[in-house]
Amino acid sequence: MPHKTEMARLVDRSSAAAIALRSVNTVEVASDGALVGHSTDGQGLMQNLRSHGVRLENSSVLVIGAGGAGRSVIDALTRHGCVHVTVANRSLEAAEFAVGFAPGGSRAISLSDEPALRRATQECDLIIHATSMGMGETGSEPVLPMPMDMLQQRHIVVDLVYHPLNTALLRAADEKGCQIVNGLGMLVHQAALQQEIWTGHLPDIQEMLSAASQALS
């Protein structure tokens, strides 16, 4: 998940979305030999949320993370009917930049500002964790991006982390009765879009999901 911002500075040119987001997760070798950057994260997440029946119209969302993945998510949420986003990040400066991709009236907060984080959680319908925190966790020391007492049963909780599939955040949310969505679907949907960029053909999503699930289980 890291290095997408750095990659945006290394390619020869980028798609309009990748330029705006300053995030590249896909590099295409063009016919002239140039390295062309693309961002498929946001579209991949939207397709995954749709497959889980998550509706974004008129929704309020808390996004934890303001890196390349977080910015892509925020931009996609805005394009798909979300009306308010709170961006929570360790660096308030990064959160303030990322909130520029959100609908008007959205706000940026520091993850260390617990009262603001609690208020944002109370106001939102959907919580999306968009950092690498928890990636590769063993379970011996659960890594949580926020205090779990903030979660309510009505929340939909999405974790972009896909290894492990059932992160500490998702386990805690499941115990609260929340609808949970792990990171595998987004990984697969955005990877399918990458394959389409590279080969011109969109692969079978279900076959990819099955193979990825087996590999990560």
Which ranges hold each PLM region?
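Short glycine-rich anion-binding loops that position phosphate/pyrophosphate groups of nucleotides
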Residues: M1-E6, A69, S132-M135, H163
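Glycine-rich adenosine-cofactor-binding loop
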Residues: S39, V54, N58-T78
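Adenosine-phosphate binding glycine-rich loop
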Residues: N58, Q153-I156, L160-S217
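Glycine-rich helix-loop-beta junction characteristic of Rossmann-like nucleotide cofactor-binding loops
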Residues: S51-R55, D149-L151
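Rossmann-like adenosine-cofactor binding region
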Residues: G104-I180
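Phosphate/diphosphate ligand-binding glycine-rich loop within oxidoreductases
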Residues: M1-H52
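NAD(P)-binding Rossmann-fold cofactor-contacting core
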Residues: H80-P103
